[in-house]
Amino acid sequence: MGLSDGEWQLVLNAWGKVEADVAGHGQEVLIRLFTGHPETLEKFDKFKHLKTEAEMKASEDLKKHGNTVLTALGGILKKKGHHEAEVKHLAESHANKHKIPVKYLEFISDAIIHVLHAKHPSDFGADAQGAMSKALELFRNDMAAQYKVLGFQG
């Protein structure tokens, strides 16, 4: 399920757009996640009180967390599939502390692709979307495998 060099290049080119405003992209991804899948909000004590999109847009904490999420993901994507150490660390915190199910990783992957396409339609066409989808699926599969090692049934 690996990606070709060309696909990785599409992923990293798209990610370059994210890096121009990691916090802004991250905030939009989390807003898309929480509005599209309100059940995911229950995993975030810090954000449970945010009920509307306007409240989410006004939240500096949400923006900071979006920055944290996409910074970590960017570091993983730049490893081009050689992300074992990063995924192990992330899976430990997401399984043991945060209890984030793999399904929620699918939801955020969809949100990432949606936000990138909405913000950068001319730079994130079908080929780039397909490559990003494959890269995020690889990440999710590796997270799921690590969850299994940890005994987490997420």
From Swiss-Prot:
What keywords appear on the UniProt entry?
A: Cytoplasm, Heme, Iron, Metal-binding, Muscle protein, Oxidoreductase, Oxygen transport, Phosphoprotein, Transport
Cellular component aspect of the GO annotation: extracellular exosome; sarcoplasm
State where the protein is found. Answer: Cytoplasm, Sarcoplasm
Question: InterPro entries from the xrefs?
Answer: Globin, Globin-like_sf, Myoglobin
**Tree of life domain:** Eukaryota
Q: Which GO terms describe its molecular function?
A: heme binding; metal ion binding; nitrite reductase activity; oxygen binding; oxygen carrier activity; peroxidase activity
In this chain, where does the modification Phosphoserine occur? S4
> Short name of one Pfam family for this protein?
Globin
Q: What is its main location?
A: cytoplasm
Record: residues binding heme b: H94
The entry's nitrite-binding residues are H65
Family membership noted in the UniProt record: Belongs to the globin family.
Name of the protein in question: Myoglobin
| Organism, scientific name | Ovis aries
**Lineage, please?**
Eukaryota, Metazoa, Chordata, Craniata, Vertebrata
